[in-house]
Amino acid sequence: MASSVVIMLRDKTNYADLTGLARLRAMVRTLGLHVIHPVVKVADGTYLAGSRSIDTEGEFLQAEVAFGAMRWHKVDPQKVVTGVEVKNPDLAKVDEVGFVDLSPGGGHGISGAFNLSALELYAKPVAR
């Protein structure tokens, strides 16, 4: 069975403040028609996907995401589908951060997928 996928990481001792100059950097490769979007889980447990997308056309490339001036949409973490737009979410206390591929894969083989490595978050720590 092929489905959408979310990959997220968290710091056990701190939230991340993604306001200001915060950045998410990763080495990524997208294949087929797949693109990935930044995704966060804010302190109240809400999952949000950002409007910026990354498409590398099969090449391994370093990608960097700035969180400012991005549109955010609610994500159902069980179904990995987007919902309504969330205006001005509070990104000062983010519990988890990562990427989401909202397109289901093609099943066996690599009809469409993404690879992710070397994930780096540049943000201010906020004590839990």
List PLM regions with ranges.
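Extracellular ligand-binding interfaces
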Residues: 1-83, 93
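Extracellular beta-strand ligand-recognition surfaces/modules
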Residues: 26, 68-119
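Charged interaction scaffolds used for protein-protein
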Residues: 121-126
